[in-house]
Regions:
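N-terminal alpha/beta PP-like core and its mobile active-site loop of ThDP/TPP-dependent enzymes
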Residues: 1-177
Length: 177
């Protein structure tokens, strides 16, 4: 889940009675997707569905954001149960890093001969475009944005040098040499 995108995918499955029998169209989707998701759920009782969905959104949005899969067998989708709506629980704020790390970063940036800013998708998700612009001005550094940061820095700004990598610009590549 390298993009850190909070996604909750709800997939359908064979009936509960057919699970694990190599039935037609049965795929162990929770195992298949395990390497690329933060967490997977297989709902075995309709009474678990609401809490599972709520928990999935909590997991997808807390810490490093990422995808969560909820697999629901076909027979569960046809059932009904009592449901009491609940207020969503707030997503906990990530802990602040140790102040010492910030001070160390400031010293490293101050001592840099050719500072360069490579901005990622966190600029977009934290709505920090203005802070990025101000930081680039303050340290007098060129800025390159990853694919996930497109739109996070004004491309008409004289500090913007384009993307890095396969679809990047020669200017951006020269800045990191």
């Amino acid at each position: 889940y390298m993009d850190s995108s909070p996604v909750v995918a709800i997939t359908g499955h064979v009936t509960t009675a057919q699970l694990g029998l190599d039935s037609f169209q049965e795929v162990d989707i929770t195992s298949v997707t395990m390497p690329v998701t933060k967490h997977n759920f297989l709902v075995r009782r309709v009474e678990e569905l609401a809490d599972t969905i709520r928990t999935a959104f909590q997991i997808a949005n807390s810490g490093r954001k990422g995808p969560v899969l909820i697999d629901v067998p076909k027979d569960i989708t046809a059932l009904k149960c009592e449901y009491t709506p609940k207020e969503p629980e707030p997503i906990p704020e990530p802990p602040m890093p140790d102040q010492g790390w910030f001070l160390k970063a400031v010293e490293l940036i101050k001592s840099a001969k050719r500072p360069f800013i490579y901005a990622g998708g966190g600029v977009i998700s934290s709505e920090a475009s203005e802070e990025l612009r101000a930081f680039a001005e303050k340290v007098d550094a060129p800025v390159s944005c990853s694919l996930m940061c497109q739109g996070g820095f004004d491309e008409l700004n004289h500090r913007y040098v384009g993307m890095l990598g396969m679809h990047g610009t020669k200017t951006a590549s020269c800045c990191i040499r």
